[in-house]
Amino acid sequence: MINIGEVIETNDMVEKENLDVRTITLGISLLDCIDSDLAKVNENIYNKITTLAKNLVSTGKEIENNYCIPIVNKRISVTPIALVGGAACKSSEDFVTIAKTLDRAAKEVGVNFIGGYSALVSKGMTKADELLIKSIPQAMLETDLVCSSVNVGSTKTGINMDAVKLIGEMIKETAEVTKHLPVSGCAKFVVFCNAPDDNPFMAGAFHGVTEADAIINVGVSGPGVVKTALEKVRGENFEVLCETIKKTAFKVTRVGQLVAKEASKKLGVPFGIIDLSLAPTPAIGDSVADILCEIGLERAGAPGTTAALALLNDQVKKGGIMASSYVGGLSGAFIPVSEDQGMIDAVNDGALTLEKLEAMTCVCSVGLDMIAIPGDTKATTISGIIADEMAIGMINQKTTACRLLPAIGKDVGDVVEIGGLLGSAPVMPVNRFSCDAFVNRGGRIPAPIHSFKN
């Protein structure tokens, strides 16, 4: 039986502690849109998206009004476009036309973002994969809502270093051609190892080929709720700390489960998963870094940070998994620098470095996220950073990713203003020693010995 205390507690979570449902993401399979004629492919894609997603935004608003729970984003993810466009696209320009079709469809149905301008190349690249990757700078320039991702490695297949090298060059080019835009194209691109098929979060969402024709995935967010709960147990031992995080994560996830089931019923689309991630925003009091400080650190990045984050990540999963029938996606604690005021403060104070962030990614989802680096950083250095992060994912059998923002014309200490949920990022120093010879070897890094389970 629900008591009045629980009602008041949930109300406070929403009104005072920034509890929200970060996204309802409708995954749509485009495999039945494949055709050898490019015009037909574009027509099929537009028609399918605008038909299946026509009520997504209105349904989200209706659920918001009914339950007074903010739903920040309504999004779409689609089948990786390298698979869909492979038969019709003979050039990078052909793929850009599909990106523009996705953008047009997203605007027609009113969603915030559409993800899936993607390629899966963990063991090798087809011609279509390569063309799509090379088209990303132009696609990011000519679209507003399209998000892109490439999976370059997995525990089972190793790391495709040819793709890693190409993506380093592509990120540099994307930063250059989109430098005049309000949001850098690099903020809408993620490179993955062990990318999940059911991720509702951008920019890395795509609708995996293992999925149904359409599916509803929901991402919840509640760093402020967790921090407020921990304020009440200051000085208590780790057992009390962990129990508090678990109970809070259960409540937050239960809200997501409610929204997901309602959206599924109203749209007539099966419920997929709840992503258990704690996703911060630039708002004061909505920070993962602040939770780490509440656990006992002076600043995120201090000794003990990796242990505190590991504890947080694990307890969020333990609590959240009991609150939903299906969990998946990335599920953990995001540590994006630009989207978390506590992280920004830690960087500005000299407490948090790129190398410490890399260590933190060993124990949480998802990786080096929304990190501004000097605009003159070499493409091979970017590839080296990506390779390091992919290796962490490959060896530890977890999802890792990089979303790096080369800030053209800016150097260490400058600030990149991105705006909205993406916030702003101080430009962080990058190790200047060369990895050119390593990146230029070519080929792939083999899968680790413990990947052989058969």
UniProtKB/Swiss-Prot annotation:
One family from Pfam that matches here is: DUF711
Where does the source fall among the domains of life?
Bacteria
Q: Which InterPro entries match?
A: UPF0210
Sorted alphabetically, which Gene3D superfamilies does this protein's record hold?
3.20.70.20
Q: Identify the PANTHER family for this entry.
A: UPF0210 PROTEIN MJ1665 (PTHR37560:SF1), UPF0210 PROTEIN SPR0218 (PTHR37560)
Describe the subunit structure. Homodimer.
UniProt lists the family membership as follows:
Belongs to the UPF0210 family.
Report the protein name in the record.
Answer: UPF0210 protein EUBREC_1565
